[in-house]
Amino acid sequence: MKTVKVSIDSIEKVKEFVTIVNEYPYDFDLVTGRYVINAKSIMGVFSLDISKPLDLNIRDAGAQINEILESLK
């Protein structure tokens, strides 16, 4: 599992983020405090406080991890 900080502090950034993570077959979770939500769920992402950076957990991405991180920049 790889964990990175992401900042998705606007509606457009949330839409773009969810579109990108849905292109991959891996599990993506957003974590803030005690809440963990599926990062592929736009409703789930909007339920979080997106004004602050969030932790993104990427599970089992293997060799594609660098490609994923590059696409999220």
What are these regions (language model features)?
Residues 1, 31, 48-52:
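Short glycine-enriched loop/turn motifs at secondary-structure junctions
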Residues 1-7:
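Short glycine-/aliphatic-rich beta-strand segments at the starts of folded cytosolic domains
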Residues 4, 26-28, 54:
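Conserved beta-strand core positions
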Residues 7-9, 31, 59:
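A structural detector for beta-sheet-dominated domains
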Residues 11-27, 35-50, 67:
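Amphipathic alpha-helical interaction surfaces in cytosolic regulatory modules
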Residues 47-73:
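C-terminal structural segments of small proteins and small subunits
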